[in-house]
Amino acid sequence: AQIGRTEALNEAVEANGWNLLAQQTGEFTQAKGQEVMESMLKQYDNINVVYCENDNEAFGAIDAIEAAGKTVGSDIANGEIMVISFDTTHAGLQDVLDGKIECDVECNPLHGPRAEELIKKLEAGEDIDKLNYVDEEIFAHDDTVKSVKATNSLDEEKDFDVTPLTQDILDKRAY
């Protein structure tokens, strides 16, 4: 997943002409995410967006941003720093509701049960589709962005809906 997330960022930077100030791994931990963000804040005074490859890194980045007296949020024109993350842990989605993470892209933990279901079908002699997917969602703090265009693992470009997160949606999630 990490390789795909990094490649997607690099492709978006190139396609949109964005200025990527720096790129460093947070090693998927809150502590390292905080350490990296503290370093970035000392090196750069014009950070607009922080792209974290999981929620733990985002939590650390948010801690560092707030400790530096800066504000996380979507109003980058007025100095806020937007945080984007992946995984959609319960705590990550709570940060989406609270406006600390602007967008959180799901990495569904239900792949295991889906694989088990497919194995049982095969063992029972049933046919299954060659390709099987577990639904995943993109959650945002508000409804500013309705969908995003991305290329899937089959190299097909498609639109993915962005769901504005509500407390009701968060409360009904199984994980």
Q: Which residues make up each language-model segment?
A:
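Hinge/cleft segment of the Venus flytrap/periplasmic-binding protein
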Residues: 11-13, 107, 111-175
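Conserved beta-strand scaffold positions in the cores of enzyme catalytic domains, especially
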Residues: 20-23, 83, 104, 138
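Local beta-strand N-terminus motif with an aromatic residue
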Residues: 20, 46-47, 101
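Hydrophobic alpha-helical
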Residues: 9, 26-94, 116
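Short, surface-exposed alpha-helical segments at coil->helix boundaries
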Residues: 2-10
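Short beta-strand elements at the ligand-binding edges of bilobed clamshell
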Residues: 23, 98-109
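Short beta-strand elements in bilobed, periplasmic/extracellular small-molecule ligand-binding domains
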Residues: 12-30
